[in-house]
């Protein structure tokens, strides 16, 4: 059985117009239009017996009803908010209207029995110039009536009138400034009024200087003064144990945060050795473009589709959907630890809900140990005293004759005795060009072959050093232990066990799973 669709009835006003003449109106429509419902009857009969007018109930006027606001212990109050009386001006207003109408001479009606001949009459010309215009100006004097700003209070009831008397306005006060100067024989006061540059007004400058004409009365009292210590003489209290920061955090808050991150029952603890974890942890989750202007100091969300799954650069960050902001803490050994709280999205339901464990990634920063000092040599030792050397006083000049050379005869004897010692053959260039390994090319240049050598970007920052042969060379050897990977033989079952996973989960090879046998039903 199909239920009939309910149609909405027309409004009560339209139904009343059509059904009133036929007499088929429903009773609820008649009562609503003619205002004869139960609520309307209560208002009609109740208002005839009870009258609440003039009390100011739910009116929002704030007049206080008929009696007004009356202070405690006094008489009747003053009506507030009534219609004020308009104060009319004392001048006689002029009526503004049309000007007086001038009569116009009209021609008498023509009798049909009279003659149609119009007699000519002599008349003067028409005066086109205007006549004399009389101008009268009336001046109405203003009466000397004092006016006061007093509130006008009126009432429309039969109660007694109450007039509020305002105080008389106070006349403006005049201020007179006087200056009195007392003479003090111990001081000389000089008063000047000179304008300075950039000032728009004059100001009195008083200079107080001590004089020699004072007299000492009585015996001066010697007051013992206390010596104020130097600012470097205060003592600094060293707490026990010594503090590591200027404003240390409360131990309760620090311990609570440390316990919340190191709880192995709730969070998986994963240490990270890659230095990218300190500055750009997103490169450990996925391969992405590097933005040098972006600082990864906030919580990051990684969205990845199951169809486009990509192996992350670091296996520890597999299935990471959210990586929190960095947190700094202190370990028991006194090292600084950088922690980030992450969430894995290992399982995803059809409704879109992601299920995964929470992981605590951390990296401990080792302390900076002080190395042994290197002995340095002092350059330019001096006693600190300045020494001035005057060249013209301490130098010795010998006046020699350049024309007479006593060594000229000796040089001539040596040349004659040993001619090979002063031979000019040593100044000749005997180098010869050898073209035995050269090749002659005729024509254009040979085309050079270019090879592209791929360069892989290393996550670690490259370090460059310049060897100084004249100074000291300090070498810090660094040794790294490589992790030896032991692969199982093909005869053993392939079972992958993650030793770094503290949760105890494992992945079993599908070949080791028991096969389900099909159950057949025999008739």
UniProtKB/Swiss-Prot annotation:
Disulphide-bonded residues? 19-25
UniProt motif Nuclear localization signal: location:
1-10, 514-522
Q: Which InterPro entries match?
A: Late_L2
Recorded GO molecular functions are: DNA binding; structural molecule activity
Keywords, ordered alphabetically: Capsid protein, Cytoplasmic inwards viral transport, Disulfide bond, DNA-binding, Host endosome, Host Golgi apparatus, Host nucleus, Host-virus interaction, Late protein, Microtubular inwards viral transport, Phosphoprotein, Viral penetration into host nucleus, Virion, Virus entry into host cell
Q: Which GO terms describe its cellular component?
A: host cell; host cell endosome; host cell Golgi apparatus; host cell nucleus; viral capsid
Q: Where in the cell is it found?
A: Virion; Host nucleus; Host early endosome; Host Golgi apparatus
An individual GO BP term: microtubule-dependent intracellular transport of viral material towards nucleus
Q: Name one Pfam family in it.
A: Late_protein_L2
PTM comment: the record says: Highly phosphorylated.
The source's domain of life comes to Viruses
Summarize the subunit comment. Interacts with major capsid protein L1. Interacts with E2; this interaction inhibits E2 transcriptional activity but not the DNA replication function E2. Interacts with host GADD45GIP1. Interacts with host HSPA8; this interaction is required for L2 nuclear translocation. Interacts with host importins KPNB2 and KPNB3. Forms a complex with importin alpha2-beta1 heterodimers via interaction with the importin alpha2 adapter. Interacts with host DYNLT1; this interaction is essential for virus intracellular transport during entry.
The entry assigns this protein to a family as follows: Belongs to the papillomaviridae L2 protein family.
Protein function: Minor protein of the capsid that localizes along the inner surface of the virion, within the central cavities beneath the L1 pentamers. Plays a role in capsid stabilization through interaction with the major capsid protein L1. Once the virion enters the host cell, L2 escorts the genomic DNA into the nucleus by promoting escape from the endosomal compartments and traffic through the host Golgi network.
| Name this protein carries in UniProt | Minor capsid protein L2
Per the UniProt record, the source organism is Human papillomavirus 24
Q: Which classification does the entry list for the species? A: Viruses, Monodnaviria, Shotokuvirae, Cossaviricota, Papovaviricetes
């Amino acid at each position: 059985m199909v239920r009939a669709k309910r149609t909405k009835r027309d409004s009560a006003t339209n139904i009343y117009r059509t059904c009133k003449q036929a007499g088929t109106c429903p009773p609820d429509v008649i009562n609503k239009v003619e205002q004869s419902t139960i609520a309307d009857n209560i208002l009609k009969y109740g208002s005839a017996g009870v009258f609440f007018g003039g009390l100011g109930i739910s009116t929002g006027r704030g007049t206080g009803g008929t009696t007004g606001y009356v202070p405690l212990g006094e008489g009747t109050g003053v009506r507030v908010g009534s219609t004020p009386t308009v104060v009319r001006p004392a001048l006689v207003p002029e009526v503004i209207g049309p000007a007086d109408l001038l009569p116009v001479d009209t021609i008498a009606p023509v009798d049909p029995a009279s003659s149609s001949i119009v007699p000519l009459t002599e008349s003067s010309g028409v005066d086109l110039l205007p006549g004399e215009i009389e101008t009268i100006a009336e001046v109405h004097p203003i009466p000397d009536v004092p006016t006061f700003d007093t509130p006008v209070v009126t009432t429309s009831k039969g109660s007694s009138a109450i007039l509020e008397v305002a105080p008389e306005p106070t006349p403006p006060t005049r201020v007179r400034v006087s200056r009195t100067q007392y003479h003090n024989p111990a001081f000389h006061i000089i008063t000047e009024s000179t304008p300075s540059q950039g000032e728009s007004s004059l100001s009195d400058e008083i200079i107080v200087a001590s004089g020699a004409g004072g007299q000492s009365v009585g015996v001066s009292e010697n007051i013992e003064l206390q010596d104020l210590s130097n600012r470097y003489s205060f003592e600094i209290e060293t707490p026990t144990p010594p503090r590591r920061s200027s404003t240390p955090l409360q131990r309760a808050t620090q311990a609570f945060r440390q316990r919340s991150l190191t709880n192995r029952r709730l969070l998986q603890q994963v240490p990270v050795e890659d230095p990218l974890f300190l500055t750009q942890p997103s490169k450990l989750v996925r391969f992405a473009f590097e933005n040098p202007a972006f600082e990864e100091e906030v919580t990051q969300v990684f969205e990845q589709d199951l169809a486009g799954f990509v192996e992350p650069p670091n296996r520890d960050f597999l299935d990471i959907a959210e990586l929190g902001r960095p947190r700094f803490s202190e370990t028991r050994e006194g090292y600084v630890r950088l922690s980030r709280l992450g969430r894995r999205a290992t399982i995803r339901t059809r409704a879109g809900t992601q299920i995964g464990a929470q992981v605590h990634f951390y990296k401990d920063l080792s302390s900076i140990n002080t190395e042994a000092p290197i002995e340095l040599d002092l350059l330019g030792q001096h006693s600190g005293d300045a020494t001035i050397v005057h060249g013209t006083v301490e130098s010795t000049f010998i006046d020699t004759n350049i024309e007479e050379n006593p060594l000229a005869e000796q040089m001539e004897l040596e040349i004659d005795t040993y001619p090979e010692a002063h031979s000019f053959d040593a100044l000749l260039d005997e180098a010869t060009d050898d073209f035995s390994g050269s090749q002659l090319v005729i024509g254009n240049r040979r085309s050079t072959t270019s090879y592209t050598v791929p360069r892989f970007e290393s996550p670690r920052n490259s370090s460059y050093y310049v060897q100084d042969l004249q100074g000291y060379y300090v070498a810090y050897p660094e040794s790294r232990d490589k992790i030896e990977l032991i692969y199982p033989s093909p005869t053993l079952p392939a079972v992958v066990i993650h030793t770094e996973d503290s949760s105890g989960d494992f992945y079993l090879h599908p070949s080791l799973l028991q096969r389900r046998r099909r159950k057949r039903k025999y008739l």
